[in-house]
């Protein structure tokens, strides 16, 4: 039974297991999410549900999106995402999905936007070794040769070079749910997840259950 939620990353902390081991966890506010649309193979070619998260003022939402939301009989939402499922019949438009959809010990995948680091060199961006620090070296953090002059007289695609680091979509797979607070829609997830504090992430069943 697949499921997915939109969540907000609140930060990291640590908890202690019964055997005294310290576990680093990420705290996320998972839901409540409202089902806005149900897609089926018969009507759309695939099975999925569209959910909204965090209420928003109507004036801050585009008119086409506002009309789409009102067709579902709901108010405006700040974030709308779609999750592909194989059993959409379980859901109806207007249903609320909360953090208790997940269980302690369950494994999940978390998708978010990594923290942007700006324009960085090849050492920070790709882990290049760099040149010598002394003995007359004039080559410290430079990328070195990026191709030959005679042939092919061009730079190959995907050559590792300086550029923008971070600020891209990242998925971390097979993270374990350590604790579920259904009253406050809080999930404690073992380990780190991509993104900054208060960033929006997608929490869904892992594609690697074993």
Curated annotation (Swiss-Prot):
Signal peptide (residue range): none
UniProtKB keywords: Ribonucleoprotein, Ribosomal protein, RNA-binding, rRNA-binding
Pfam families: Ribosomal_L3 (PF00297)
GO CC term, one of those recorded: cytosolic large ribosomal subunit
InterPro entries, per the entry: Ribosomal_uL3 (IPR000597), Ribosomal_uL3_bac/org-type (IPR019927), Ribosomal_uL3_CS (IPR019926), Transl_B-barrel_sf (IPR009000)
Gene Ontology terms: biological process: translation
Domain of life: Bacteria
GO terms of molecular function: rRNA binding; structural constituent of ribosome
SUBUNIT field: Part of the 50S ribosomal subunit. Forms a cluster with proteins L14 and L19.
Similarity section: Belongs to the universal ribosomal protein uL3 family.
Function statement: One of the primary rRNA binding proteins, it binds directly near the 3'-end of the 23S rRNA, where it nucleates assembly of the 50S subunit.
Descriptive protein name: Large ribosomal subunit protein uL3
Organism of provenance: Geobacter sulfurreducens (strain ATCC 51573 / DSM 12127 / PCA)
Lineage of producing organism: Bacteria, Pseudomonadati, Thermodesulfobacteriota, Desulfuromonadia, Geobacterales
Gene: rplC
